[in-house]
């Protein structure tokens, strides 16, 4: 079980680092002001939680199947 927890933590760190490492184009000053006014800080957290709740159980079940096979 400790192995699965370690694998899950590594998966999370790698996935989150890819999200934050992606380059984004510079927005125009007008668009940036509009985006700041409409920004939703909870949107990013929701996306991460969605990945964790859907991807992590699938990864764990895949690892369990591979361990049972070999």
Curated annotation (Swiss-Prot):
Primary localization class, coarse: secreted
GO biological process terms held by the UniProt record: killing of cells of another organism; monoatomic ion transport
Compartment(s): Secreted; Target cell membrane
Keywords from the UniProt entry: Allergen, Amidation, Antimicrobial, Cytolysis, Formylation, Hemolysis, Ion transport, Membrane, Porin, Secreted, Signal, Target cell membrane, Target membrane, Toxin, Transmembrane, Transport
Tissue-wise expression: Expressed by the venom gland.
Site (Important for the flexibility at the center of the helix, flexibility that is important for the stability of the voltage-gated pore): 57
GO function terms (MF aspect): porin activity; protein kinase inhibitor activity; toxin activity
Cleaved signal peptide residues: 1-21
Residues annotated with N-formylglycine modification: 44
Propeptide section residues: 22-43
A Gene Ontology cellular-component term: pore complex
Modification type Glutamine amide: residues: 69
Role summary: Main toxin of bee venom with strong hemolytic activity and antimicrobial activity. It has enhancing effects on bee venom phospholipase A2 activity. This amphipathic toxin binds to negatively charged membrane surface and forms pore by inserting into lipid bilayers inducing the leakage of ions and molecules and the enhancement of permeability that ultimately leads to cell lysis. It acts as a voltage-gated pore with higher selectivity for anions over cations. The ion conductance has been shown to be voltage-dependent.
Family from the record: Belongs to the melittin family.
Subunit comment: Monomer (in solution and for integration into membranes), homotetramer (in solution and potentially as a toroidal pore in membranes), and potenially homomultimer (as a toroidal pore in membranes).
Name of the protein: Melittin
The species this protein was found in: Apis cerana cerana (Oriental honeybee)
Gene symbol of the encoding locus: MELT
């Amino acid at each position: 079980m400790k192995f699965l927890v370690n694998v899950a933590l590594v998966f999370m760190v790698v996935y989150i680092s890819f999200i934050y490492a992606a380059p984004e184009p510079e927005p125009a000053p007008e668009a940036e002001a509009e985006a700041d006014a409409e920004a939703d800080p909870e949107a990013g957290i929701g996306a991460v939680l969605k990945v964790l709740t859907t991807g992590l159980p699938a990864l764990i079940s895949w690892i369990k199947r591979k361990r049972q096979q070999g």
